[in-house]
From Swiss-Prot:
The keyword Zinc does not apply. InterPro entries: Ribosomal_uS15, Ribosomal_uS15_bac-type, uS15_NS1_RNA-bd_sf. This is Small ribosomal subunit protein uS15. Part of the 30S ribosomal subunit. Forms a bridge to the 50S subunit in the 70S ribosome, contacting the 23S rRNA. It comes from Nautilia profundicola (strain ATCC BAA-1463 / DSM 18972 / AmH). The keyword Acetylation does not apply.
Length: 91
């Protein structure tokens, strides 16, 4: 379940340094969060879709690793990202 390009550009513009900044941890966390939310909505309707559930767990783990990295390298940006995305400080 990929994000459409308009939504992706909007997220990159909000969290990136410029419109081509797709690799910074903040942008990656925001994109992963959006994908996680979409898959979560899908799983609420399709409870027996186990392959999507495994993909969701993989994305959550990847986001957790990126959040841990961002917290260690740039704590202020980390706090800004988790408040903007309504995430908990669990890492």
């Amino acid at each position: 379940m990929a994000l459409d390009s308009a939504k992706k550009r909007e997220i990159i513009a909000k969290f990136g340094n410029d419109e081509k900044d797709t690799g910074s941890p903040a942008v990656q966390i925001a994109l992963l969060t959006e994908r996680i939310n979409e898959i979560n909505e899908h799983l609420q309707q399709h409870k027996h879709d186990h392959s999507s559930r495994l993909g969701l767990l993989k994305l959550v783990g990847q986001r957790k690793r990126l959040m841990r990295y961002l917290k260690r390298k740039d704590h202020d940006k980390y706090l800004e990202v988790i408040t903007a995305l309504n995430l908990r400080d669990r890492v």
